[in-house]
């Protein structure tokens, strides 16, 4: 199994090194990661700038290719020819923070895995909930990733499917397992913060409190709150099928 690994937190993120380490136990791994943090960049692609890539090392000293593009650029560049062959799976993460529910619309982590689908390669996005004490421990995430990717290797995934995996901030001993769940809803409480530079010109920050989570049964948010890792199948088709027939009944003539 040949696995392409990337992230959106940048090549020096400890989550990326932890992901590469566990996947190296399962298959052959190639890392192509961005040279900086692209959190919340979504599926941004650099269409009007050249891309550059060079050899480097991750935070644990393991080898990687570093790219000055976005997470999606890293995947496209790798599949289009930076690697010597097409990967069997694209895995993005381990993101330093949740990608639950509505977060997927913003997530560079998820977008990188989705870029694999554009090229016919199934994807896995991996994120870990931010620990309250700020001390990152990826062992539980590695347990969940190992179990899931071994099942993927055994059973396979269709090329149009992305799996979104979130892991709570727990130890391997207290992780209750993996629960398959649908996307939940997070309500963002953003605020516009206005400040002024020394010349009196305004500049802006978009800030705010933590999102309000709707912890409905069967959602990824509920699974995390119960101590499970959440696993959600995601597809590229964003069509609202419920509204297709309704819109067709509108008066178009």
From Swiss-Prot:
Pfam families: SurE. Its cofactor is a divalent metal cation. One of its GO terms (cellular component) is cytoplasm. The keyword Metal-binding applies. It comes from the Bacteria. Keywords: Cytoplasm, Hydrolase, Metal-binding, Nucleotide-binding. One of its GO terms (molecular function) is 3'-nucleotidase activity. It is found in: Cytoplasm. It catalyses: a ribonucleoside 5'-phosphate + H2O = a ribonucleoside + phosphate. A divalent metal cation binds at residues 8-9, 39, 95. Binds 1 divalent metal cation per subunit. InterPro entries: SurE, SurE-like_Pase/nucleotidase, SurE-like_sf. Its EC number is 3.1.3.5. Its main location: cytoplasm. NCBIfam families: PRK00346.1-4, surE. Nucleotidase that shows phosphatase activity on nucleoside 5'-monophosphates. This is 5'-nucleotidase SurE.
């Amino acid at each position: 199994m040949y696995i392409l690994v990337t992230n959106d937190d940048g090549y020096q993120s400890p989550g990326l090194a932890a992901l590469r380490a566990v996947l190296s136990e399962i298959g052959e791994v190639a890392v192509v990661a961005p040279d900086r943090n692209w959190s919340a960049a979504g599926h941004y692609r650099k269409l009007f700038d050249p891309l550059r890539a060079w050899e480097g090392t991750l935070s644990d000293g393991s080898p990687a290719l570093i790219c000055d593009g976005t997470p999606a650029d890293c995947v496209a560049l790798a599949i289009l020819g930076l690697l010597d062959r097409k990967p069997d799976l694209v895995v993005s993460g381990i993101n330093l923070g949740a990608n639950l529910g509505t977060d997927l619309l913003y997530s560079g982590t998820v977008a990188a895995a989705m870029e694999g689908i554009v090229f016919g390669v199934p994807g896995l996005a991996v994120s870990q909930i931010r620990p309250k004490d700020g001390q990152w421990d990826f062992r539980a995430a590695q347990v969940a990733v190992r179990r899931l990717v071994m099942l993927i290797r055994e059973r396979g995934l269709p090329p149009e499917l992305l799996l979104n995996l979130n892991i709570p901030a727990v130890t391997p001993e207290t992780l209750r397992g993996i629960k398959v769940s649908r996307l939940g809803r997070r309500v963002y409480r953003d605020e516009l913060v206005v400040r002024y530079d020394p010349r009196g010109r305004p500049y802006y920050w978009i800030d705010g409190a933590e999102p309000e989570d709707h912890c409905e049964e069967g959602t990824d948010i509920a699974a995390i709150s119960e101590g499970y890792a959440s696993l959600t199948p995601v597809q590229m088709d964003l069509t609202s099928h419920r509204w297709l027939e309704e819109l067709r009944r509108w008066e178009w003539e």
